[in-house]
């Protein structure tokens, strides 16, 4: 085996996760503002020793999967099977053309895997060919019978809780999965059990107590509180934008195409509301302004839709491990009237940012017929953004 070995990863995300509640697969729920599946994928996608990441998903989830993992680099997802075992086999078969030396198999419902744990998995598989991370059991364990009565008290010193990523030589675990399928065995709950059944010696290495699997609603409540408490660097930014009227029959405001007797004079679509929000978010990040990221001298932004700019700003927050707590924009104009459009604007901003509409405010005022807005020569907008970042997240994402 080469050193370092060619390592690929399979992220199993085809389950329905109904025990977690919320009416949908748990891997697509957000945790501290970010989808669980994105949290699980990113450490593998960015690990320097992992050259290929293969997601396995339910084909019915294609749209929500694509929305959840924007910006991550991985192989096209393949459809899973009727069981976790079948889904892993589908991922292994998809990787067969690459023939990696080692494969890491990880559950998407474990979003707290660390680069260090991934590195330990690669080393362990290189040494023994089959290995899984484990953590000790601190509580006394009881074995009970069908009536709920205690039958035995196992020695907890020899018991461990299994985690993922489980790591294997690719050829041996692929062969074990194929043999199990031929023999009609589809009842294994993890890949180490298949390796054991196939006669392989499975070693263990130190896991991580924080690398827990999200299963129940209480798991989400607890981890949401823990992650939010870590985001103690609370920042506020402000933004301002203005555009003059020119010829046209509509204006773009807060992501909506609004009929009007004038248009905007602008390099992009001139959406003053979204531009002000972008500057507010970038200001909270101390990350320049909209002009430094999208220069008006660059022809690629000519006529560009401003929702692209706002999505980019939101991604900058996520790249720093943060979340947006609140967005507020105030439109300053005589016409068009903002009141009838307010709720549609809030909904559109929520759609662009992925935030609940309850965290978005759209307000309107006039300048009492004073100044350029009072003379109906253009529209102005002010905005504020409150974000939460983890302490020590000063470095900008590339």
Curated annotation (Swiss-Prot):
Which HAMAP family is this protein grouped with? IspD, IspDF, IspF
GO BP, one annotated term: terpenoid biosynthetic process
Single GO MF descriptor: 2-C-methyl-D-erythritol 2,4-cyclodiphosphate synthase activity
Q: Where does 4-CDP-2-C-methyl-D-erythritol 2-phosphate bind?
A: 241-243, 267-268, 289-291, 365-368, 372, 375
Q: Which organism is it from?
A: Rhodopseudomonas palustris (strain BisB5)
Which controlled-vocabulary keywords does the entry list?
A: Isoprene biosynthesis, Lyase, Metal-binding, Multifunctional enzyme, Nucleotidyltransferase, Transferase
Q: Which residues are listed under the site Positions MEP for the nucleophilic attack?
A: 156, 213
The organism's taxonomic lineage, starting at the top: Bacteria, Pseudomonadati, Pseudomonadota, Alphaproteobacteria, Hyphomicrobiales
> Where in this protein does the record put region 2-C-methyl-D-erythritol 4-phosphate cytidylyltransferase?
1-234
This one is known as: Bifunctional enzyme IspD/IspF
